[in-house]
């Protein structure tokens, strides 16, 4: 079953400026045209997560408007840069369905595709979401749970053609001298800074993505619900944590794949977000000597600094102040 989502969205320089104002991202590739052109891009591309949130937002009315929770992500691939002035559209195919034991909710698995006006894929990812059944007594068909890769293979990563991340990469302008070669598997990085979430900012951000899920907007209904207040969109947390990761990962200039991710606890306005990262793996990219990939685990907390790298325990249970566990591949320049 495939769903074509309304409506297309042209991303502009204004959208990019607003995204920067919301999160304070400082990565050089998405900040400066001259810097990007030196690497072979035609201009500074739209931030990868702004593309992700825009495509995600297109799917909400058809997939998760009244969702209980967005549960996770897998097999995300950024396939082509998006530039200001380009129009994006989205479609999704249902690839799995599982009824929960309470018979009142179930989990839907979808693969969503984002395309530009030429029909070229710029993004593809899987997510699964818990939704309520319209009729709790209705019979559900056969359970189908898709087999998803634990991570995107380095062979499937897609640095843009015609780019050179190493030769003219200016580490003074980028804010860090450290390249792919300087990181070690198992290394942990505290990103130090914190950022407090405001009610108006997260609603503005969610509207920017045309994400209409009522849990983020409607205090009248959410005030009567489980938490008694509006829930911060999980993507807002991802973008905040990614922006904070500039401290220590300034040259991780592109997200090239999303391996997985979980929103493990809720976030509300007034909470302060901190983050830390762990290097899970390093990979060379076939036929590219200028750029390598780091597999990074980005963990975000609320109201807790990360000097001790707060994490799940041996049983897999997370502390109440850990809110995000996000696994992704990032591109970094290599040493020549």
Give the predicted meaning of each segment.
Residues 7-10, 83, 205, 266-268, ...:
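Amphipathic alpha-helical hairpins
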Residues 46-47, 79-86, 233, 265-269:
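Short, low-complexity cationic-aromatic patches
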Residues 1, 82-161, 269, 276-336:
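HotDog/MaoC-like acyl-thioester-processing domains
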